[in-house]
């Protein structure tokens, strides 16, 4: 995770991919930009990299929190969730809402 975060931090100069599903877009970027990627693409990939490492860190945090047998409830709760759906409206019709589900790490 530290190398992924480091690459994401330096997204102005490097491209980081954390999902093989992004390979096709990377190849298109390289073809369209004379072997380079755009800053917008690098920013989007950096955001995905940080999301991936945050989910990993949350999973580790939860493992340690629940590994402590002396506590009924952990002192803090860290979760990583993914948007599953954008809902028609929130609690009231003028509000926006979305449904989030636990992310698999």
What feature does the model see in each segment?
Residues 1-13, 18-22:
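Short alpha-helices
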Residues 21-105:
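Active-site loops and adjacent core secondary-structure elements that bind or stabilize anionic groups
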């Amino acid at each position: 995770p530290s190398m992924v975060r480091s690459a994401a931090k330096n997204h102005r100069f490097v491209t980081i991919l954390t999902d093989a599903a992004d390979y096709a877009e990377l190849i298109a970027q390289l073809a369209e930009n004379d072997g380079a990627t755009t800053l917008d693409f690098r920013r989007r990939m950096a955001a995905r990299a940080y999301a991936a490492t945050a989910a990993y860190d949350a999973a580790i945090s939860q493992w340690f929190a629940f590994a402590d047998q002396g506590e009924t409830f952990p002192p803090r709760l860290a979760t990583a969730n993914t948007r599953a759906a954008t809902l028609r409206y929130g609690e009231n019709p003028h509000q926006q809402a979305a449904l989030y589900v636990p992310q698999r790490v």
